[in-house]
């Protein structure tokens, strides 16, 4: 099963509540933090919501 490596590359300041809630759900609490999440439609949807704030890539786990 593959996973996604997600990194917050832009700060959280000035973002709307929906974007902040999505970043919290992804556990991206500060700039340059990296998390590994399972590759599923829910996580992909969260990435789509904050695509302009994060970088992500697929990894094999």
From Swiss-Prot:
It comes from the Bacteria. Keywords: Ribonucleoprotein, Ribosomal protein. One of its GO terms (cellular component) is large ribosomal subunit. The keyword Nucleotide-binding does not apply. CDD domains: Ribosomal_L30. The keyword Ribonucleoprotein applies. SUPFAM superfamilies: Ribosomal protein L30p/L7e. One of its GO terms (biological process) is translation. GO terms for molecular function: structural constituent of ribosome. InterPro entries: Ribo_uL30_ferredoxin-like_sf, Ribosomal_uL30_bac-type, Ribosomal_uL30_ferredoxin-like. Coiled coil: none annotated. Part of the 50S ribosomal subunit. HAMAP family: Ribosomal_uL30_B. Belongs to the universal ribosomal protein uL30 family. This is Large ribosomal subunit protein uL30. The lineage of its organism: Bacteria, Thermotogati, Thermotogota, Thermotogae, Petrotogales.
């Amino acid at each position: 099963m593959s996973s996604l490596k997600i990194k917050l590359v832009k700060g959280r300041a000035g973002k709307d509540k929906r974007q902040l809630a999505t970043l919290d759900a992804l556990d991206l609490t500060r700039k340059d933090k990296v998390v590994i999440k399972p590759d599923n439609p829910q996580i992909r949807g969260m990435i789509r919501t904050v695509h302009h704030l994060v970088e992500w890539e697929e990894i094999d786990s």
